[in-house]
Amino acid sequence: MGNIKSRVNELHDLLNQYGYEYYVQDNPSVPDSEYDKLLRELIDIEEAHPEFKSPDSPTVRVGGEVQSSFEKVNHDTPMLSLGNAFNEQELRRFDQRIREQVGSVEYMCELKIDGLAVSLKYVEGRFVQGLTRGDGTTGEDITENLRTIHAIPLKINEPLSFEVRGEAYMPRSSFIRLNEEKEKNEEQPFANPRNAAAGSLRQLDPKLAAKRKLSVFLYSVNDFTDFDATTQSGALDELDRLGFKTNHERMRVGDIEGVLEYIEKWTKQREQLSYDIDGIVIKVNDIEQQDEMGYTQKSPRWAIAYKFPAEEVVTTLQDIELSIGRTGVVTPTAILDPVRVAGTTVSRASLHNEDLIHERDIRIGDSVVVKKAGDIIPEVVKSITERRPEGTLPYSMPTHCPSCDHELVRIEGEVALRCINPKCQAQLVEGLIHFVSRQAMNIDGLGTKIIQQLYHHNVINDVADIFYLTEDDLLPLERMGSKKVENLLKAIEDAKANSLEHLLFGLGIRHLGVKASQVLAEKYETMDRLLEVTEEELISIHDIGDKLAQSVVTYLENEDIKALIEKLKYKNVNMVYNGIKTSDIEGHPDFKNKTIVLTGKLQQLTRKEASAWLELQGAKVTSSVTKKTDLVIAGEDAGSKLTKAEKFGTEIWTEEQFVAKQNEISS
């Protein structure tokens, strides 16, 4: 036994050293095959002698047991956000304020990694807990997923107790591999590496997180008690010494001019990195000066984040492709010469509608400027007319549907062209794809390509047909083995139990979104009651307007739709609301039964987190301000919704007021 224990310790040391060289120093001393061989040996020993497996064994990198949920945990000290600067003038104002308060100052400039903020707690040198930022006060415990990231040391060589914070991210190479795998499996690819990293760390199965090949850069120490560092740069050097991965592109500068030079450099060179950045973080380097300056309620006064402007690139517009949505809207898409924009290769970009094409005089063959709105959605900004080839013609939208050849119409008050043929194949297929989507019936494994095959082989013609599928229908399809078919049929069976709001949203009734589906399902409880509802009844409901009421009643009165519902009932698809009713939520009197709108950029929590918390308090969170809105919570750069709220005399809170009320209720 002594020899086995000794070998286990030796394997720990070797694997930790080789992992540090590969994942932190990026300078491996042994080939991957040697690392894999040693890891396999350790796994075999631990399986034969589980008494020798420790919580910080290198084998935890492959992932442990599936978790049922992520526990909410309070941060020892809040994980605050940073104030933003978008131009040189705002940076100079920040510098002036700093110097007025503390005098002479040195700055530490660091790359702002585009990932997910995490907090890692070490006790006596061992990694014991990892949290997401959450709302800044409370995060989710994702310890088991973070253990799979090789760049996070499970144990350090000194028995120190402290908290270190950083950014978990997905390298571009991992992102490309992951999306290739998703496309191969007919799954929706991630929009960008940031979303991929966040989604990976929220997997309940750590083994899935382990496969995603995430990394991390650590950038701050929360408690300096066990550290000799007196500066931010010194703290990062100390983290380096202890074996943590920090970003070595950081730079100390003596004044704001040095900051601006650093920003200029990385604005030009960001694409040369192997990971995404979305800005530069500027911090006062001296920790005593940081303490002197202190914090606002939401951010440190001694730091600011400079956000890069949306990157614009020039490429050639090769064609304009038209797609038909499930409601018949014809959407033009630019087909481009592939070009890298904000970290990903773009070959398609939105053109929105016919009016935009004409306003910007965009023509096939033009050199066009492309950017990503919010660094996510590619769009064509303009044509460069001085580069326009001779003989190009203004683009004309077709008069007939490219799918069914039905005449296209423009409904009064709308900018979109629309196909109104209810038998249009493109619309029917898009409707099927919508029906199985995550927010609708959430049928995992029934992707776009499978639906297209089933439709074009006349196996399914409407959404009810999905519940009549058999093994014989699915096995002949491309890439459909018996195991995949078994899993898909189970997912279809499970979907039958979905609450009524999922079915309502999945049916694709025009103007009926997720929130309104929830409202109707909760109000009427069964599909049978909904089938009898009148427009007047619907309009009297707080969140239902005239257009939606008319659309719902017209849809449900259609005899074909009534037959479709009967067809779904025959296969025991649930037609009853089985969620929690708002009236049953205890909630808080400041929010219960109130209609609330969130607008602007929230700094201390995400829009999704704020909405979820408000709904737990019994509120209804909607997307538009009306005379029926009770409260508007306005973040930074709030626009027309705030103006509308002021016009209606609606109560308005700042984000700070909202967070203060959250803290009051939670305490």
From Swiss-Prot:
Keyword Ligase in record: yes
Which biological process annotations from GO are given for this protein? DNA repair; DNA replication
Catalytic reaction list: NAD(+) + (deoxyribonucleotide)n-3'-hydroxyl + 5'-phospho-(deoxyribonucleotide)m = (deoxyribonucleotide)n+m + AMP + beta-nicotinamide D-nucleotide
UniProt: NAD(+) binding residues: D32, S33, E34, Y35, D36, S81, L82, E110, R133, E167, K283, K307
Q: Which GO terms describe its molecular function?
A: DNA binding; DNA ligase (NAD+) activity; metal ion binding
Record keywords, A-Z: DNA damage, DNA repair, DNA replication, Ligase, Magnesium, Manganese, Metal-binding, NAD, Zinc
What does UniProt give as GO cellular component? Answer: cytosol
| Residues annotated as the enzyme's active site | K112 (n6-amp-lysine intermediate)
Known role: DNA ligase that catalyzes the formation of phosphodiester linkages between 5'-phosphoryl and 3'-hydroxyl groups in double-stranded DNA using NAD as a coenzyme and as the energy source for the reaction. It is essential for DNA replication and repair of damaged DNA.
**What is the official name of this protein in its record?**
DNA ligase
Whose protein is this, by species?
Staphylococcus haemolyticus (strain JCSC1435)
Q: Name the gene that codes for it.
A: ligA
